[in-house]
Amino acid sequence: MDPRSEVMLRQAELFQGPLLIAGAPADGLLGQLPKAHGWTWHAGDQALLESRFGNRCHHGVGVPEVAFDAAILFLPKSRELAAYLLNALAARLAGRELYLVGEKRGGIEGAAKQLQAFGKPRKLDSARHCQLWQVTVDHAPEAKPLESLAERFELPLEDGPLQVVSLPGVFSHGRLDKGTALLLEHLDGLPSGHVLDFGCGAGVLGATIKRRYPQSQVTLLDVDAFAVAASRLTLAANGLEGQVISGDGIDAAPGELDLILSNPPFHTGVHTDYQASENLLKKSGEHLRKGGEIRLVANSFLRYQPLIEGALGNCEIRAEAQGFRIYRATRG
Protein backbone atom coordinates (compact mmCIF):
# COMPACT_ATOMS: atom_id res chain seq x y z
CA MET A 1 0.00 0.00 0.00
CA ASP A 2 1.11 3.56 -0.71
CA PRO A 3 2.85 4.93 2.43
CA ARG A 4 0.61 8.02 2.29
CA SER A 5 -2.42 5.73 2.48
CA GLU A 6 -0.89 3.97 5.47
CA VAL A 7 -0.42 7.28 7.29
CA MET A 8 -3.99 8.24 6.49
CA LEU A 9 -5.33 4.94 7.83
CA ARG A 10 -3.50 5.51 11.13
CA GLN A 11 -6.25 8.13 11.63
CA ALA A 12 -8.99 6.05 10.00
CA GLU A 13 -11.67 7.22 12.44
CA LEU A 14 -11.52 10.67 10.79
CA PHE A 15 -12.43 9.30 7.38
CA GLN A 16 -15.50 7.12 7.93
CA GLY A 17 -18.03 9.58 6.47
CA PRO A 18 -18.57 10.72 2.87
CA LEU A 19 -15.04 11.56 1.73
CA LEU A 20 -13.40 12.58 -1.54
CA ILE A 21 -9.84 11.31 -2.02
CA ALA A 22 -8.18 13.57 -4.61
CA GLY A 23 -5.18 12.08 -6.35
CA ALA A 24 -6.25 8.67 -5.09
CA PRO A 25 -3.47 6.09 -5.38
CA ALA A 26 -4.14 2.79 -7.14
CA ASP A 27 -4.02 0.71 -3.98
CA GLY A 28 -6.59 -0.75 -1.59
CA LEU A 29 -7.37 2.49 0.26
CA LEU A 30 -10.94 2.77 -1.05
CA GLY A 31 -11.59 -0.75 0.16
CA GLN A 32 -10.82 0.40 3.72
CA LEU A 33 -13.12 3.44 3.48
CA PRO A 34 -16.51 2.29 2.13
CA LYS A 35 -18.08 5.77 2.03
CA ALA A 36 -15.18 7.36 0.15
CA HIS A 37 -14.94 8.25 -3.53
CA GLY A 38 -11.66 8.49 -5.41
CA TRP A 39 -10.69 11.18 -7.92
CA THR A 40 -7.66 10.78 -10.16
CA TRP A 41 -6.27 12.47 -13.26
CA HIS A 42 -4.01 9.51 -14.13
CA ALA A 43 -5.59 7.21 -16.71
CA GLY A 44 -3.72 4.13 -15.52
CA ASP A 45 -4.70 4.63 -11.90
CA GLN A 46 -8.31 5.22 -12.97
CA ALA A 47 -8.43 1.93 -14.88
CA LEU A 48 -7.06 0.01 -11.89
CA LEU A 49 -9.36 1.72 -9.40
CA GLU A 50 -12.42 1.34 -11.60
CA SER A 51 -11.78 -2.38 -11.99
CA ARG A 52 -11.82 -2.78 -8.20
CA PHE A 53 -14.23 -0.11 -6.98
CA GLY A 54 -16.50 0.65 -9.95
CA ASN A 55 -18.40 3.93 -9.92
CA ARG A 56 -16.70 5.12 -6.73
CA CYS A 57 -13.81 6.31 -8.93
CA HIS A 58 -13.77 9.48 -11.03
CA HIS A 59 -11.33 10.77 -13.65
CA GLY A 60 -10.80 14.29 -14.99
CA VAL A 61 -9.59 17.80 -14.22
CA GLY A 62 -12.60 19.05 -12.23
CA VAL A 63 -13.94 18.11 -8.80
CA PRO A 64 -16.40 15.23 -9.30
CA GLU A 65 -20.08 15.99 -8.83
CA VAL A 66 -20.50 13.68 -5.85
CA ALA A 67 -21.52 14.48 -2.28
CA PHE A 68 -18.74 14.61 0.31
CA ASP A 69 -18.38 16.08 3.80
CA ALA A 70 -14.58 16.12 3.80
CA ALA A 71 -11.75 15.77 1.30
CA ILE A 72 -8.11 14.77 1.33
CA LEU A 73 -5.53 15.66 -1.30
CA PHE A 74 -2.61 13.34 -1.99
CA LEU A 75 0.03 15.96 -2.73
CA PRO A 76 1.03 16.08 -6.41
CA LYS A 77 4.53 16.96 -7.58
CA SER A 78 3.53 20.34 -9.03
CA ARG A 79 3.06 23.19 -6.56
CA GLU A 80 0.80 25.01 -9.04
CA LEU A 81 -1.38 21.93 -9.43
CA ALA A 82 -1.60 21.51 -5.65
CA ALA A 83 -2.77 25.13 -5.35
CA TYR A 84 -5.49 24.59 -7.97
CA LEU A 85 -6.70 21.37 -6.35
CA LEU A 86 -6.73 22.75 -2.80
CA ASN A 87 -8.67 25.79 -3.98
CA ALA A 88 -11.18 23.63 -5.86
CA LEU A 89 -11.72 21.36 -2.85
CA ALA A 90 -11.90 24.16 -0.27
CA ALA A 91 -14.54 25.92 -2.38
CA ARG A 92 -16.81 22.92 -1.73
CA LEU A 93 -16.03 22.55 1.98
CA ALA A 94 -17.07 25.72 3.84
CA GLY A 95 -16.97 24.98 7.57
CA ARG A 96 -15.75 21.44 6.99
CA GLU A 97 -12.48 19.53 6.95
CA LEU A 98 -9.80 19.51 4.26
CA TYR A 99 -6.80 17.21 4.65
CA LEU A 100 -3.44 17.06 2.90
CA VAL A 101 -1.06 14.10 2.91
CA GLY A 102 2.29 13.77 1.21
CA GLU A 103 5.87 12.60 1.37
CA LYS A 104 8.50 14.73 3.05
CA ARG A 105 10.72 14.54 -0.02
CA GLY A 106 7.71 15.61 -2.09
CA GLY A 107 7.55 18.91 -0.20
CA ILE A 108 4.64 18.30 2.16
CA GLU A 109 5.88 20.75 4.81
CA GLY A 110 6.03 23.62 2.34
CA ALA A 111 2.76 22.63 0.67
CA ALA A 112 0.96 22.59 4.03
CA LYS A 113 1.49 26.35 4.22
CA GLN A 114 -1.00 26.69 1.36
CA LEU A 115 -3.70 25.55 3.80
CA GLN A 116 -3.29 28.83 5.73
CA ALA A 117 -5.45 30.57 3.14
CA PHE A 118 -8.46 28.60 4.38
CA GLY A 119 -7.97 28.48 8.17
CA LYS A 120 -5.50 27.31 10.80
CA PRO A 121 -3.77 24.11 9.62
CA ARG A 122 -2.38 21.56 12.03
CA LYS A 123 -0.22 18.50 11.59
CA LEU A 124 -2.06 15.34 12.64
CA ASP A 125 0.56 12.68 12.03
CA SER A 126 4.06 12.00 10.75
CA ALA A 127 5.17 8.50 9.78
CA ARG A 128 6.53 6.50 6.84
CA HIS A 129 8.44 9.64 5.75
CA CYS A 130 5.03 11.28 5.22
CA GLN A 131 2.89 13.87 6.99
CA LEU A 132 -0.87 14.31 7.37
CA TRP A 133 -2.28 17.83 7.76
CA GLN A 134 -5.81 19.13 8.44
CA VAL A 135 -7.59 22.47 8.23
CA THR A 136 -11.16 23.50 8.97
CA VAL A 137 -12.21 25.65 6.01
CA ASP A 138 -13.19 28.89 7.76
CA HIS A 139 -12.50 30.95 4.63
CA ALA A 140 -13.96 29.14 1.64
CA PRO A 141 -12.60 30.59 -1.62
CA GLU A 142 -14.37 30.97 -4.92
CA ALA A 143 -13.45 28.14 -7.23
CA LYS A 144 -11.01 29.31 -9.91
CA PRO A 145 -11.70 28.09 -13.45
CA LEU A 146 -8.83 25.88 -14.56
CA GLU A 147 -8.30 27.92 -17.72
CA SER A 148 -7.65 31.02 -15.61
CA LEU A 149 -4.46 29.30 -14.41
CA ALA A 150 -3.24 28.48 -17.91
CA GLU A 151 0.18 29.70 -19.02
CA ARG A 152 0.12 30.87 -22.63
CA PHE A 153 3.26 31.43 -24.63
CA GLU A 154 4.32 31.70 -28.26
CA LEU A 155 6.85 29.50 -30.02
CA PRO A 156 8.66 31.11 -32.95
CA LEU A 157 8.77 28.40 -35.63
CA GLU A 158 9.87 28.52 -39.28
CA ASP A 159 6.28 28.46 -40.52
CA GLY A 160 5.11 31.10 -38.05
CA PRO A 161 4.48 31.40 -34.32
CA LEU A 162 2.68 28.57 -32.53
CA GLN A 163 0.43 29.40 -29.58
CA VAL A 164 0.95 27.00 -26.66
CA VAL A 165 -1.43 26.64 -23.71
CA SER A 166 -0.08 24.86 -20.64
CA LEU A 167 -1.90 23.91 -17.44
CA PRO A 168 -0.67 23.29 -13.89
CA GLY A 169 0.91 19.88 -13.50
CA VAL A 170 1.73 19.48 -17.19
CA PHE A 171 5.35 18.69 -18.03
CA SER A 172 7.47 21.81 -18.52
CA HIS A 173 4.52 24.03 -17.54
CA GLY A 174 4.71 27.46 -19.12
CA ARG A 175 7.87 26.92 -21.17
CA LEU A 176 9.41 24.79 -23.90
CA ASP A 177 11.76 22.12 -22.56
CA LYS A 178 15.18 21.58 -24.17
CA GLY A 179 14.40 18.08 -25.43
CA THR A 180 11.28 19.08 -27.33
CA ALA A 181 13.07 22.16 -28.67
CA LEU A 182 15.76 19.90 -30.15
CA LEU A 183 13.21 17.53 -31.66
CA LEU A 184 11.40 20.47 -33.29
CA GLU A 185 14.64 21.22 -35.14
CA HIS A 186 14.74 17.69 -36.59
CA LEU A 187 11.29 17.09 -38.06
CA ASP A 188 12.52 16.87 -41.64
CA GLY A 189 11.73 13.95 -43.94
CA LEU A 190 8.79 12.65 -41.93
CA PRO A 191 6.34 10.14 -43.42
CA SER A 192 2.81 11.41 -44.01
CA GLY A 193 -0.36 9.74 -42.79
CA HIS A 194 -1.46 8.94 -39.24
CA VAL A 195 0.82 10.54 -36.63
CA LEU A 196 0.90 9.88 -32.88
CA ASP A 197 2.25 12.43 -30.40
CA PHE A 198 2.99 10.09 -27.48
CA GLY A 199 3.13 11.72 -24.03
CA CYS A 200 1.82 14.89 -25.64
CA GLY A 201 2.00 17.24 -22.64
CA ALA A 202 0.75 20.62 -23.85
CA GLY A 203 0.51 19.34 -27.43
CA VAL A 204 3.49 21.15 -28.95
CA LEU A 205 4.62 18.31 -31.25
CA GLY A 206 1.13 17.31 -32.35
CA ALA A 207 0.09 20.88 -33.10
CA THR A 208 3.32 21.57 -35.00
CA ILE A 209 2.82 18.50 -37.20
CA LYS A 210 -0.85 19.20 -37.84
CA ARG A 211 -0.11 22.75 -38.95
CA ARG A 212 2.89 21.76 -41.06
CA TYR A 213 1.17 18.73 -42.63
CA PRO A 214 -2.57 19.56 -42.54
CA GLN A 215 -3.55 16.41 -44.46
CA SER A 216 -2.07 14.20 -41.74
CA GLN A 217 -4.31 12.58 -39.16
CA VAL A 218 -2.86 13.51 -35.77
CA THR A 219 -3.57 11.72 -32.49
CA LEU A 220 -2.24 13.07 -29.20
CA LEU A 221 -2.00 10.72 -26.21
CA ASP A 222 -1.17 11.32 -22.56
CA VAL A 223 -1.78 9.53 -19.28
CA ASP A 224 -2.54 12.82 -17.50
CA ALA A 225 -5.96 14.48 -17.78
CA PHE A 226 -4.44 17.95 -17.37
CA ALA A 227 -2.12 17.30 -20.32
CA VAL A 228 -5.08 16.12 -22.40
CA ALA A 229 -6.95 19.33 -21.53
CA ALA A 230 -3.89 21.47 -22.31
CA SER A 231 -3.36 19.79 -25.69
CA ARG A 232 -6.97 20.47 -26.65
CA LEU A 233 -6.52 24.12 -25.70
CA THR A 234 -3.30 24.35 -27.73
CA LEU A 235 -4.96 22.89 -30.81
CA ALA A 236 -7.92 25.26 -30.43
CA ALA A 237 -5.63 28.28 -29.95
CA ASN A 238 -4.09 27.56 -33.36
CA GLY A 239 -7.33 26.66 -35.15
CA LEU A 240 -6.25 23.04 -35.53
CA GLU A 241 -8.09 19.75 -35.21
CA GLY A 242 -6.77 16.50 -33.82
CA GLN A 243 -7.83 13.57 -31.69
CA VAL A 244 -6.65 13.93 -28.09
CA ILE A 245 -7.03 10.82 -25.95
CA SER A 246 -6.31 9.86 -22.36
CA GLY A 247 -4.62 6.51 -21.91
CA ASP A 248 -1.92 4.69 -20.00
CA GLY A 249 1.00 4.12 -22.33
CA ILE A 250 1.39 2.84 -25.87
CA ASP A 251 -1.23 0.12 -25.34
CA ALA A 252 -3.87 2.88 -25.47
CA ALA A 253 -2.65 4.09 -28.89
CA PRO A 254 -4.29 3.25 -32.20
CA GLY A 255 -2.63 0.82 -34.60
CA GLU A 256 -1.54 1.28 -38.20
CA LEU A 257 0.43 4.44 -37.45
CA ASP A 258 2.79 6.00 -39.97
CA LEU A 259 4.76 7.98 -37.41
CA ILE A 260 5.28 8.10 -33.65
CA LEU A 261 6.82 11.28 -32.26
CA SER A 262 7.71 11.55 -28.60
CA ASN A 263 9.65 13.16 -25.82
CA PRO A 264 8.79 10.22 -23.58
CA PRO A 265 8.31 10.69 -19.84
CA PHE A 266 10.37 9.01 -17.15
CA HIS A 267 8.89 10.45 -13.96
CA THR A 268 5.76 9.54 -12.02
CA GLY A 269 5.25 12.16 -9.31
CA VAL A 270 8.57 12.54 -7.49
CA HIS A 271 9.67 9.03 -8.49
CA THR A 272 11.67 7.94 -11.53
CA ASP A 273 9.66 5.52 -13.69
CA TYR A 274 10.89 4.28 -17.06
CA GLN A 275 8.08 1.78 -17.67
CA ALA A 276 5.96 3.89 -20.04
CA SER A 277 9.00 4.87 -22.12
CA GLU A 278 10.42 1.35 -22.28
CA ASN A 279 7.03 -0.10 -23.24
CA LEU A 280 6.78 2.49 -26.01
CA LEU A 281 10.13 1.42 -27.42
CA LYS A 282 9.50 -2.31 -27.09
CA LYS A 283 5.97 -2.21 -28.53
CA SER A 284 6.30 0.54 -31.14
CA GLY A 285 6.43 -2.01 -33.94
CA GLU A 286 2.99 -3.31 -32.96
CA HIS A 287 1.48 0.12 -33.67
CA LEU A 288 3.43 1.11 -36.79
CA ARG A 289 2.59 0.21 -40.36
CA LYS A 290 5.32 -1.46 -42.38
CA GLY A 291 7.71 1.36 -43.24
CA GLY A 292 6.38 3.47 -40.36
CA GLU A 293 8.81 5.48 -38.27
CA ILE A 294 9.43 6.35 -34.65
CA ARG A 295 11.36 9.52 -33.91
CA LEU A 296 11.99 10.62 -30.36
CA VAL A 297 14.20 12.71 -28.11
CA ALA A 298 15.65 11.48 -24.83
CA ASN A 299 18.36 12.29 -22.34
CA SER A 300 21.69 11.01 -23.62
CA PHE A 301 22.33 8.93 -20.49
CA LEU A 302 19.23 6.78 -21.12
CA ARG A 303 20.13 3.55 -22.95
CA TYR A 304 17.24 3.59 -25.39
CA GLN A 305 19.11 2.58 -28.55
CA PRO A 306 19.34 -1.17 -27.65
CA LEU A 307 15.62 -1.24 -26.85
CA ILE A 308 14.72 0.36 -30.17
CA GLU A 309 17.04 -1.96 -32.08
CA GLY A 310 15.55 -4.94 -30.28
CA ALA A 311 12.04 -3.92 -31.28
CA LEU A 312 12.61 -2.66 -34.83
CA GLY A 313 16.01 -4.04 -35.82
CA ASN A 314 17.49 -0.63 -36.53
CA CYS A 315 18.12 2.71 -34.87
CA GLU A 316 20.10 5.77 -35.81
CA ILE A 317 21.08 8.81 -33.78
CA ARG A 318 20.01 11.80 -35.88
CA ALA A 319 21.40 14.49 -33.59
CA GLU A 320 22.92 15.08 -30.17
CA ALA A 321 23.07 18.36 -28.26
CA GLN A 322 22.70 19.77 -24.73
CA GLY A 323 22.53 16.32 -23.16
CA PHE A 324 19.81 14.99 -25.50
CA ARG A 325 19.72 12.63 -28.47
CA ILE A 326 17.30 12.30 -31.37
CA TYR A 327 16.62 8.66 -32.27
CA ARG A 328 15.03 7.45 -35.49
CA ALA A 329 13.98 3.94 -36.49
CA THR A 330 11.63 2.37 -39.02
CA ARG A 331 9.58 -0.79 -39.06
CA GLY A 332 10.79 -3.10 -41.80
From Swiss-Prot:
Q: Which residues form the signal peptide?
A: none
**Protein location:** Cytoplasm
**InterPro entries per UniProt:** DNA_methylase_N6_adenine_CS, Mtase_sm_N, rRNA_ssu_MeTfrase_C, RsmC/RlmG, SAM-dependent_MTases_sf, Small_mtfrase_dom
What terms describe the molecular function in GO for this protein? Answer: 16S rRNA (guanine(1207)-N(2))-methyltransferase activity; nucleic acid binding
Tell me how this protein assembles. Monomer.
What does the similarity note say? Belongs to the methyltransferase superfamily. RsmC family.
Name of the protein described by the UniProt record? Ribosomal RNA small subunit methyltransferase C
Species this chain originates from: Pseudomonas entomophila (strain L48)
* Upper lineage: Bacteria, Pseudomonadati, Pseudomonadota, Gammaproteobacteria, Pseudomonadales
